[in-house]
């Protein structure tokens, strides 16, 4: 018997991806050990927006399946997880963007998503704080919000899961080396630690994308839906330089989250005044009343992005025993349940409800070294 064998599965990373994988595996009867260094990761830094995106079929399948799973899990979540289905309202500033909204509407409707096109007058009725002159919008009714740090903590407190705060300095297939030099082994090791994954697997094509967020003081509720400009999609996939887009999310506390920004080629966690100002200016262009609210805190986080915008979910093709759940960029909270279900289906050699192929690590890391 191997004295270092400590669990059926070791998961590196206690964010929402690692926590959801741990919960799903534990509910299949496996003993799970979750190791995390305790650094401020994307789960703590993000908005917790649960949304369906349809930029490509694989993204739509992953996000739509995940939102269904979140709705199934919702009755179990404690109140501090702040789960709400408040919908996303995509804002069209002009006729060109309204045409994009119409195209998204037809696509989502064809895939069974509850959505509604909203004209200029109806938009102001739904969200009176928006500026005059917007062309309209697209309401995705099943989208929602979640306080992801609380959800991750709840998941990790479930039966069959042990969590340790410790830094992993090396990974070799079925085993990991801790900061003090001790090795721990399991039948399976899952890497789910976001941008830190490249420290253990330098071959992973993961790029950090820095983002800023601001939260306001508490005010009487004035915003119902999560408000996102349709230009956000273009901004999110901009690969050449810094960008901002209006993203305003109401919290159950009466506060507003305000985003969003993207920067490349930096790991500096400091809030940058010029970028924060640019982001807030963009949000005020859509909701002028924001200029009169008190912002109480601003912070940054890093999205772990893959070259094609889809996560790497599956076995590492060159490292036997090592599995990957990384590269979710800004959709980690949304797609955590689908990620976990895809991994579990592969581990148990079971069919999955969505195709695994688009997310397999082989597309970047090559085919397995052996047949």
Question: Positions of the model-derived regions?
Answer:
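Helical element adjacent to the flavin cofactor pocket in flavoenzyme catalytic cores
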Residues: 138-173, 178-180
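Short beta-strand to alpha-helix junction loop
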Residues: 61, 90-100, 138-154, 270-275, ...
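Dinucleotide-binding Rossmann-like beta1-alpha1 core, especially the glycine-rich loop
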Residues: 47-126, 283-284
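Active-site substrate-recognition segment that forms the wall
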Residues: 23-27, 50, 81-83, 193-317
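C-terminal catalytic lobe of FAD-dependent flavoproteins
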Residues: 284-371
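Beta1/beta-strand and adjacent pyrophosphate-binding region of the FAD-binding site
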Residues: 3-15, 33
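Glycine-rich FAD pyrophosphate-binding loop
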Residues: 26-44
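Short hydrophobic core segments
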Residues: 10-12, 184-196, 340
């Amino acid at each position: 018997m191997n004295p270092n064998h400590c669990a059926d599965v070791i998961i590196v990373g206690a964010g929402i991806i690692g926590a959801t994988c741990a919960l799903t595996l534990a509910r299949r009867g496996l003993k799970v050990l979750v190791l995390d260094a305790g650094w401020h990761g994307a789960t703590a830094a993000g908005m917790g927006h649960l949304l369906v995106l349809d930029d490509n079929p694989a993204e739509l399948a992953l996000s739509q399946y995940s939102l269904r799973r979140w709705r199934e899990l919702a009755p179990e979540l404690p109140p501090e997880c702040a789960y709400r289905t408040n919908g996303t309202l995509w804002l069209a500033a002009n006729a060109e963007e309204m045409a994009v909204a119409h195209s998204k509407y037809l696509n989502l409707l064809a895939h069974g998503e509850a959505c509604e096109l909203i004209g200029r007058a109806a938009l102001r009725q739904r969200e009176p704080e928006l500026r005059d002159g917007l062309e309209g919008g697209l309401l995705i009714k099943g989208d929602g919000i979640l306080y992801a740090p609380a959800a991750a903590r709840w998941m990790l407190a479930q039966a069959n899961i042990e969590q340790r705060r410790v830094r992993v300095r090396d990974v070799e297939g079925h085993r990991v080396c801790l900061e003090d030099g001790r090795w721990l082994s399991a039948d399976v090791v899952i890497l789910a630690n976001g941008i830190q994954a490249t420290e253990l697997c330098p071959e992973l094509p993961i790029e950090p994308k820095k983002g800023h967020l601001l939260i306001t003081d508490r005010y009487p509720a004035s915003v119902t839906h999560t408000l996102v400009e349709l230009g956000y999609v273009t901004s999110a996939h901009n690969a050449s330089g810094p960008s901002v887009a209006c993203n305003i999310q109401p919290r159950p506390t009466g506060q507003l989250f305000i985003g969003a920004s993207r920067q490349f080629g930096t790991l500096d966690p400091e809030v940058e005044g010029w970028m924060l100002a640019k982001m807030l200016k963009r949000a005020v262009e859509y909701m002028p009343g924001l200029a009169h609210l008190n912002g109480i805190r601003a912070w940054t986080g890093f999205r772990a992005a893959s070259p094609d915008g889809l996560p790497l979910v599956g076995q590492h093709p060159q490292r036997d025993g090592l599995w990957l759940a990384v590269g979710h960029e800004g959709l980690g909270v949304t797609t955590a349940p689908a990620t976990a279900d895809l991994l579990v289906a592969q581990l148990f050699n079971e069919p999955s409800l969505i195709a695994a192929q688009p997310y397999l690590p082989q597309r970047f890391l090559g085919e397995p070294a052996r047949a």
